Amino acid sequence: MLSMSNDRADTGGRILRAAASCVVDYGVDRVTLAEIARRAGVSRPTVYRRWPDTRSIMASMLTSHIADVLREVPLDGDDREALVKQIVAVADRLRGDDLIMSVMHSELARVYITERLGTSQQVLIEGLAARLTVAQRSGSVRSGDARRLATMVLLIAQSTIQSADIVDSILDSAALATELTHALNGYLC
């Protein structure tokens, strides 16, 4: 028999998956809470018990999705080379991700790119800072405040993801990965 907490987690997961499918199908700006509830097979009050509004669902969905991508691209070592390899692989995966690209072309993206750090960005900064601290101890990453370094790494990678399409005629996917690798290695040395 399932516990209520397992059922609740499953319902939350269904809601987030429904939100993701709505974003891919309609774009972030046209997603409604009613459509998310319909696709998840739950009532609107069920959704409201977990999230106060559609924007909160979008934030949770993005954080969950990015965490999933990070789990799919493992870190193969504690040094700068392994970390840069993972960052480049994650950036490549996110550039080709329908959900992320749908979000990038929305009003929501403008908020998280120009006005404030979102939860997923903060999680990435904290995770990167922890990994950079380990790499600093081994001497493969230069000294400095790990959170500041992590924030700059996030800005470099985020800019690459956002701008990849507009420079595709100059930097195809492989060349972009090579140049991002050089940029990150140069910054972190």
Swiss-Prot record:
Organism from which the protein derives: Mycobacterium tuberculosis (strain ATCC 25618 / H37Rv)
Pfam families named in the record: TetR_N
Gene Ontology terms: biological process: regulation of DNA-templated transcription
Keywords, in A-Z order: DNA-binding, Transcription, Transcription regulation
DNA-binding region: 32-51
InterPro entries for the chain: DNA-bd_HTH_TetR-type_CS, Homeodomain-like_sf, HTH-type_TetR-like_transc_reg, HTH_TetR, Tet_transcr_reg_TetR-rel_C_sf
Molecular-function GO terms, alphabetical: DNA-binding transcription factor activity; transcription cis-regulatory region binding
Superkingdom of origin: Bacteria
Protein name: Uncharacterized HTH-type transcriptional regulator Rv2250c
Domain HTH tetR-type intervals: 9-69
